[in-house]
A protein has these predicted regions:
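Interfacial segments of multi-pass membrane proteins
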Residues: 217, 223-236, 326-351, 408-421
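Loop-to-helix entry and N-terminal half of a specific, functionally important transmembrane alpha helix
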Residues: 367-408, 414
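Hydrophobic alpha-helical transmembrane segments
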Residues: 67-72, 141-142, 346-363, 424-427
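Transmembrane alpha-helix boundary/anchor motif
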Residues: 148, 249, 253, 271, ...
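Hydrophobic, glycine- and aromatic-enriched re-entrant/interface helices and adjoining loop segments
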Residues: 121, 125-127, 240-351, 376-377
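Hydrophobic alpha-helical segments of polytopic membrane proteins
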Residues: 70-73, 93-100, 193-209, 213-264
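Membrane-helix boundary/helix-loop-helix interface segments in multi-pass membrane proteins
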Residues: 2-29, 42-43, 49-211, 397-412, ...
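Alpha-helical transmembrane segments of multi-pass membrane proteins, especially transporters
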Residues: 188-196, 240, 329, 380-388
Length: 473
């Protein structure tokens, strides 16, 4: 019976490892996904303060999150099993249209009861409620625009190759249809990039600026990074970035000079500039009379960022342990915008370093996958999404450690926020699906790589054998 039980265990273990070996996507990315989700479940369960949840107890909260995790894993699995890159490429063409339409509804503050309603939350227009579901527009825009630019850069390259061969291009038909007429200049490479890349980026950032200045700057930086990954001319990118920065500074200057009378729709510009100049120091309270209105206004302003700094400081090397956080009772949204501070408080510097290594590993693995992709769209999509996820993670960490301006960026796949979590699951699903294309080449190179110290291994073993013989004498 014991032997049969052992054989059954060995058979089960064999099937498990065979299943692992047969996973076609990048295994390192899979490990990163599951590690981030594990941190998310543990951290959200522990960070949920019963004092803050009111009508919900902790188990209700964690059950909701586990359900979202299940849906997210389902999205990842569904996208992972799409084996044709053309499906992603076709859908990516709609990225700018989807972003523009959602931002338009948000910026116009559309309210059609029961259908779609723009929502004003925490002093900003950020979300749409569609048929009862809350959609965080900026999260969709980030991923959609990265994928759109991946398509545009791929389409431009294919278009130029077709024209060099004197063949009819099936891409960028709008510009090509202008060839030979008064608008012939639109068929030139610079104007094609301007129409399909630079103008969509500019429009998107301006529309995001109406709701969040910091998000507009962050999204603009990520999209410029995607252009660099795709090989767009550095000179043109520099000009486009300078134009965008000049436009932003002009809006900020006019808004501040006229006290908001010019460009009143950009009310978040004032918030953005205030956050860049803000000083979240407890010493600011010393010159105010305790109990006064000004005292409590200043206290409310610094409470969350200052408590996040306290959480990081009190975490030490190993942290307070699961459930040991005290700052979760002070920071109302610690499981969202201040998740990294909470993790460091409970898991210490060790936990913080693990989180950092996971995101850095994702960026490194994304770069490796991209370098092995033969398809231009696949390379840019994986590289762009990896930069987006890692960039947002580090932006979140900078806010939590008071080394960057205040923004509302969550920690990807860890922070609470059902819609943001699902959007990043889509991003990971695309990365894993595309990694199938590069897996065989990566595996072949890893297998071919010589082990470290291969030449010395036999010498070491021979020395050990001699020592063993001496002991036996």
């Amino acid at each position: 019976m014991a032997a049969e039980s052992t054989r059954q265990k060995e058979s089960t273990n064999g099937r498990f490892w065979n299943f692992i070996d047969n996973i076609e996507g990048d295994k390192v990315v899979w490990v990163i996904v599951f590690m981030l989700i594990l941190f998310s479940i543990l951290a959200i369960f522990s960070s949920t303060s019963l004092l803050k949840e009111g009508s919900k107890d902790r188990m209700d909260f964690i059950r909701d999150h586990i359900m979202i995790v299940g849906v997210g894993l389902g999205l990842i699995a569904g996208l992972y099993n799409i084996k044709r890159i053309g499906v992603f490429r076709v859908l990516s063409q709609l990225g700018f249209v989807v972003s523009f339409f959602m931002l338009l509804l948000l910026d116009l503050h559309v309210k059609i009861p029961g259908v779609v309603e723009a929502e004003y939350i925490n002093g900003a227009w950020r979300t749409l409620r569609v048929a009862g579901f809350q959609l965080h527009v900026f999260e969709v825009v980030k991923v959609a625009m990265v994928l759109y630019l991946a398509w545009a850069l791929h389409a431009f390259k294919e278009d130029q190759e077709a024209l060099k061969k004197r063949q009819k291009s099936k891409y960028m038909r709008l510009s090509n249809s202008c060839a030979g007429g008064r608008l012939d200049f639109l068929s030139r490479p610079f104007w094609k990039r301007t129409i399909y890349m630079y103008i969509p980026i500019l429009i998107t950032c301006v529309m995001v600026l109406m709701g969040s200045g910091s998000s507009a700057v962050f999204i603009g930086a990520i999209l410029i990074s995607v252009l660099l990954i795709g090989g767009a001319p550095f000179k043109e990118i520099g000009i486009a970035a300078a134009v965008g920065l000049g436009l932003l500074l002009s809006i900020v200057g006019l808004y501040n000079a006229t006290d908001g009378k010019v460009f009143p729709i950009f009310e978040r510009v004032a918030t953005m500039t205030t956050r860049f100049e803000a000083d979240y120091d407890v010493d600011n309270l010393k010159h105010l009379r305790k109990g006064s209105r000004e005292f409590y206004e200043e206290l409310d302003k610094i409470k969350q960022p200052y408590s996040a700094k306290i959480a990081v400081h009190e975490g030490g090397i190993l942290g307070k342990g699961i459930g040991g956080s005290t700052q979760k009772y002070v920071v109302s949204n610690i499981y969202g915008d201040y998740m990294f501070s909470f993790i460091v408080e409970e898991y210490g510097l060790v936990g913080g370093i693990i989180i950092i290594l996971l995101y850095v590993s994702l960026l490194a693995r994304g770069a490796l996958i991209a370098s092995k992709c033969t398809n231009e769209y696949a390379k840019i999509a994986v590289g762009g999404l990896s930069v987006l996820i890692t960039g947002q993670a580090f932006m979140h960490m900078m806010v939590n450690t008071d080394t960057g301006p205040m923004t509302g960026q969550t920690l990807p796949l860890i922070s609470h926020g059902s819609f943001a979590f699902l959007v990043f699951c889509i991003a990971f699903g695309v990365i894993l699906s595309i990694s199938r294309m590069a897996r065989k080449q990566i595996k072949a190179e890893e297998d071919a790589a010589a082990p470290l110290y291969e030449g010395e291994r036999d010498d070491i073993q021979a020395s050990l054998d001699i020592l063993e013989q001496i002991d036996q004498i």
